[in-house]
Swiss-Prot record:
GO terms for cellular component: autophagosome; endoplasmic reticulum. This is Sushi-repeat-containing protein SRPX. Residues 1-30 form the signal peptide. Residues 177-259 form the HYR domain. Glycans are attached at S34. It comes from the Eukaryota. The keyword Zinc-finger does not apply. Disulfide bonds join C57-C85, C69-C103, C89-C115, C120-C161, C147-C174, C262-C304, C290-C317. Residues 57-117, 118-176, 260-319 form the Sushi domain. Keywords: Disulfide bond, Glycoprotein, Proteoglycan, Repeat, Signal, Sushi. GO terms for biological process: autophagy; negative regulation of cell proliferation involved in contact inhibition; phagolysosome assembly; positive regulation of extrinsic apoptotic signaling pathway in absence of ligand; response to endoplasmic reticulum stress. The keyword Flavoprotein does not apply.
Amino acid sequence: MGSPGLRPELLLPQVLPLLLALLHVLPSQGFPGSGDSPLEDDGVWYSHSLYKDTPWCSPIKVKYGDVYCRAPPGGYYKTALGTRCDIRCRKGYELHGSSQLICQSNKRWSDKVICKQKRCPTLTMPANGGFKCVDGAYFNSRCEYYCSPGYTLKGERTVTCMDNKAWSGRPASCVDLEPPRIKCPSVKERIAEPNKLTVRVSWESPEGRDTADGILTDVILKGLPPGSNFPEGDHKIEYTVYDRAENKGTCKFRVKVRVRRCGKLNAPENGYMKCSSDGDNYGATCEFSCIGGYELQGSPARVCQSNLAWSGTEPSCAAMNVNVGVRTAAALLDQFYEKRRLLIVSTPTARNLLYRLQLGMLQQAQCGLDLRHVTVVELVGVFPTLIGRIRAKIMPPALALQLRLLLRIPLYSFSMVVVDKHGMDKERYVSLVTPMALFNLIDTFPLRKEEMILQAEMGQTCNV
């Protein structure tokens, strides 16, 4: 057994007071790894620098960042008390916390730091479109814009979240640049209706369609609308539609109208021609008449037929041949029905002054009489020496007497009677009448108004 003086249980009471005194004497020196801050006491020769090369704080590791530490002067360990560390985040990450950490006496660094991935502002969803991103709005995420059908992308299609937390390029938008679609109908050539120069043409109005939102704001038609009567010729029809973006779509087509024609007819010599419609188109009717003193021979009217040939025969105007050999006055008047007007001048003797003066005035106004289809009939004398004369033709005394009796013309005095084309007694005179007064009367007759229009078209006039 060993010496009793070396037994531990015997030495402990003697050593313990010495250890306590030692701890009391050196409180400013600290203990490596204790975390206690040393006291700066000039009276103690132990210096803080004694522990400057002793690991103190835990090593720093920053995810997605780099740490650059500087140990206290003369030190080696970069976790010693007083070590300063600069923190830098890698590209695309940003520092949250202090950019410089100091190893403190409490064995803790002066701050907690973290490198977080940078994030760009959330992109605005474009109207009528959208976008798709690889990694949301984080750094280096790539987003691609797209547009709904009918819309066109305006701006950059692809943007990337950059290191400055901004997106590359400007935000894109979706605009309606595509014009609306419209399809016009196909209208075949049309033939004008009978006796007309037009034809009614109808079609279904085209319906436009917008490729974007399907909404059209306006439809404009240039040309005649469907259901109109189109005249002969080539007609351009144009439809224009607009969408809400003011894009326009247009379609065009033509309506061609053809008039079937028989060829122009001419008025007969010494006659008139009055035609309906355009005068030679399918269904047109041409009516013919002759000037005073002439009779119509041939067809009084001709029609342009579907085979483009005129009906009837070609008319002509022949000088009127009055038959004075008829047996009755009525038969004589029938020859003038709807052809001529009559001015019957009756006198008991050729020496009658009123008769002679009146006949002289009528001879000077012969053009006006012919223009108004007036035939002068002279009844001179008293039966049985009565003479009836129509220009160069002499009627029998008995026929002349019948005419006086039929029209109730006085036998023994000067008298004049105006008879219209329907055989009606229109006016009587017992004294002289000027040609102008006579013409003014005749010009009021219903048939005369139509004649005046035709004569004006033909250029037939007189100075009286």
